[in-house]
Every structure is written in structure tokens, then in C-alpha cells.
Amino acid sequence: MKASELREKSVEELNAELLGLLREQFNLRMQHATGQLTQTNQLKLVRRNIARVKTIITSKAGA
């Protein structure tokens, strides 16, 4: 998801998005640990998306 799309969302929607991303990260980590994950780049993408959402939440809280 692009940062511009995230900036348009409310804080509540961003928190819901963050929760979904954290769950996805957990599932990907479990798949990676059991050797079922074939696209390991997904871990990196989800981690960066989490950082994007957290950054925007922080900037909205300060504004």
C-alpha cells in the first residue's frame, strides 16, 4: 500500500490496518520457520508496510 493512500485514512483505520499487518507478519514468520514460505521477500515488504503505517500514525498524532 502506498503512503499517499495511507495518509487519507483515519487513525482508527490505520490502527486496523496495522493490526492486520502484524497478524500477516506473524503468519509469514511461522511459515518461514516451518519452511513453507517460498516468497521470503514478503517478510521484508510487510515489515516496511508496518513501518509506513506506524510513521503515519505518529505524524497524525502530532498534528
Swiss-Prot record:
InterPro entries: Ribosomal_protein_uL29, Ribosomal_uL29, Ribosomal_uL29_CS, Ribosomal_uL29_sf. Keywords: Ribonucleoprotein, Ribosomal protein. GO terms for biological process: translation. One of its GO terms (cellular component) is cytosolic large ribosomal subunit. One of its GO terms (molecular function) is structural constituent of ribosome. Disulfide bonds: none annotated. Belongs to the universal ribosomal protein uL29 family. This is Large ribosomal subunit protein uL29. It comes from Shewanella baltica (strain OS155 / ATCC BAA-1091). The gene is rpmC.
